[in-house]
Design a protein with these regions (language model features):
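Sec-exported extracytoplasmic/periplasmic mature domains
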Residues: 119-126, 140, 149, 188, ...
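Extracytoplasmic cell-surface/polysaccharide-interacting catalytic and binding patches
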Residues: 7-113, 201-204, 210-237
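Short secondary-structure capping micro-motifs at structural edges
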Residues: 101-102, 115-120, 155-156
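Stable alpha-helical elements in mature extracytoplasmic
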Residues: 106-113, 117, 140, 179-186
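Charged, often glycine-rich, active-site loop that binds/positions anionic groups
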Residues: 139-155
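Catalytic cores and adjacent binding grooves of peptidoglycan-active enzymes
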Residues: 19-25, 152-241
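Acidic helix-start/capping segments at beta-turn-to-alpha-helix junctions
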Residues: 127-144
């Protein structure tokens, strides 16, 4: 299945980060504005945020019959029962220092996904992946939405999937082109299997990834037949250049 994706991915990403050319006819006027000479990177992600994606994320939450966590009391109850588990920093994973320790939690299968991705990423690039956000309460989401009009709502059919604890935001800002491509390939493969629903958010430059509980079952098959989703596509794309 991985080889079937190689051709599409190699072509789709060829111009993803093309740069705007500087118009030579405007050099004189630009000399009065020192910052204007900086070339801007075109935003062309593989996983664009969309209304349909939010619907799919909420459909998964409804399928699992998970609650949207209302407040800190409900959050602490889910921690106590083990329905939410802690995300812990390690050699392969770091956590954004501003993330409230009380919200460094997620569903067990989501943590498995984060740990698996962080390990293969570390094996490839010898660097850590960073978690910027995990579980949120409705109260927190409403506060976030007041500050950021692009944030998902706290209620309704397109509510943020962070409210169910099945979603994490992973740092995208500061990654190299190859690092971004590696993560995109990894997510593309898992999305094709119906295991994740990813988005690349421009405002916060992060990978927003909702993880299905089906990831647990798929993960067990990888224990028997080890395979990292990004390996073959990433190698094939690099050798074709």
């Amino acid at each position: 299945m991985v080889f079937a994706l190689v051709g599409f991915l190699a072509g789709a990403r060829g111009t993803a980060f093309a740069l705007h050319n500087v118009d030579p006819h405007h050099r004189a006027s630009r000399s009065h504005h020192p910052l204007r000479h900086i070339r801007r990177v075109r935003w062309n992600p593989l996983f664009r945020p969309s209304h349909d994606s939010l619907l799919r994320q909420n459909e998964e939450i409804d399928r699992l019959q998970l609650p949207r966590i209302i407040d800190d009391a409900q959050l602490e109850e889910l921690k106590a029962t083990g329905e939410l588990v802690p995300i812990e920093a390690s050699e392969t994973l770091r956590i954004e220092h501003g993330l409230d320790p009380s919200r460094r939690y997620c569903r067990p299968w989501t943590r498995d996904f984060v740990e698996d991705l962080s390990q293969v990423y570390y094996d490839r690039f010898h660097d850590q992946i960073q978690v910027n956000s995990a579980v949120r309460t409705v109260k927190v989401q409403k506060k976030l939405r007041r500050r950021n009009r692009n944030a998902a709502p706290a209620e309704g059919e397109t509510a943020s999937s962070h409210l169910a604890g099945i979603t994490v935001d992973l740092q995208r800002r500061g990654l190299t082109k190859d690092e971004i491509r590696f993560i995109e390939y990894y997510l593309f493969y898992l999305r094709a299997l119906g295991l994740v629903e990813p988005e690349e958010e421009r405002r916060h430059w992060c990978f927003h990834v909702m993880v299905s509980d089906r990831y647990e079952e798929w993960r067990q098959t990888q224990t028997l037949f080890p395979h990292h989703p990004a390996d073959e596509t990433f190698v094939a794309d690099n050798t074709s250049q």
